[in-house]
Amino acid sequence: MKLLVYGAGVCGSLFSARLHEAGLDVSLLARGERLASLRRHGVQLADGDGTAVRRVPVPVVEHPAGGYDLTAVLVRTHQVDAVLESLAGLEGDVLFLHNWAAGAEPLGEAIGHERVLLGFPPALAAGTMDGDVVRPRATTFMTRRVPMPIGEPDGRTTQRLERIVREFRTAGINAKAEPRMDAWLKTHAAFEVPLGQEVHAAGGPVALADDPDAVRGMLHLVRQNLAAMPTSPVPRTFAALQTLPEGLLVALLRRFLRSPTAVNSGLSNASPATVAELGRLAEQMRAHAKVR
């Protein structure tokens, strides 16, 4: 299978490096200064918090027209429109691996419904960018056990879905076919948007934990989002946010926000790109609620 990873930020760089080191035929699409850096140095991966840097010579390209069997898109939500324009008129399946709450319909309208698959990137693709060097976020036993979900928009288990899951598993990626991928993504957004926006408004996860009223308000927004969904939450464990007592959930959320998991996660990233992505996700959820 000839693969293209579209997006050379943290997620795309880490994902393509893993696939390349596993021996898969993969290229990484980049533009501008990032493209020039990758051509000179390859994907540069920092070794933990140290200064040692490992270079992975992933082939890089500037355009997506290369006869790829599968293009994996790893960009921010608000960057997807530009990606769709560049993929329209090409052939090959496209796996969208990013935050998305608008469903598969607008993606299919732009590039062809038969090409679209939905998913979400694995924990191994998380980290931070330090100049041109990617610092992978340390994984834990629990995060390594969380599978990377991939699914057909209509929930079917198709030959291409099974083939893609097998391909990623050969690279050591814990991929799994998810029959309710659209509901999975909407559930994730229902929780992530209020959490991320409240964390940024407070000045960080610990600052939010110190304000129980703000945590309670965030929980109310999460519950509103989940109630607006046309289906039950996926995974089903998110239903606990609708049923457990408010006081218990507020206490658990405050404890989580103070944990190293939250402090060292993307929640501490208040970059303009993160703010723009959360804003676009919020727009998608509002539009979905109006249609419903």
Could you tell me what each predicted segment is?
Residues 223-292:
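NAD(P)-dependent Rossmann-like dehydrogenase/reductase catalytic/cofactor-binding core
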Residues 3, 25-27, 94, 116, ...:
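Hydrophobic anchor at the start of a short beta-strand
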Residues 100, 105-184:
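Rossmann-fold dinucleotide-binding core
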Residues 182-226:
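Active-site-proximal catalytic alpha-helix in oxidoreductases
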Residues 60-61, 82, 157-168, 205, ...:
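Soluble, non-transmembrane catalytic domains of enzymes that act on hydrophobic metabolites at membranes
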Residues 43-60, 192:
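N-terminal glycine-rich dinucleotide-binding loop that anchors FAD/FMN and/or NAD(P) in oxidoreductases
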Residues 1-51:
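NAD(P)+-binding Rossmann beta1-loop-alpha1 motif at the extreme N-terminus of oxidoreductases
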Residues 52-136:
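Rossmann-like NAD(P)(H) cofactor-binding subdomain of soluble oxidoreductases
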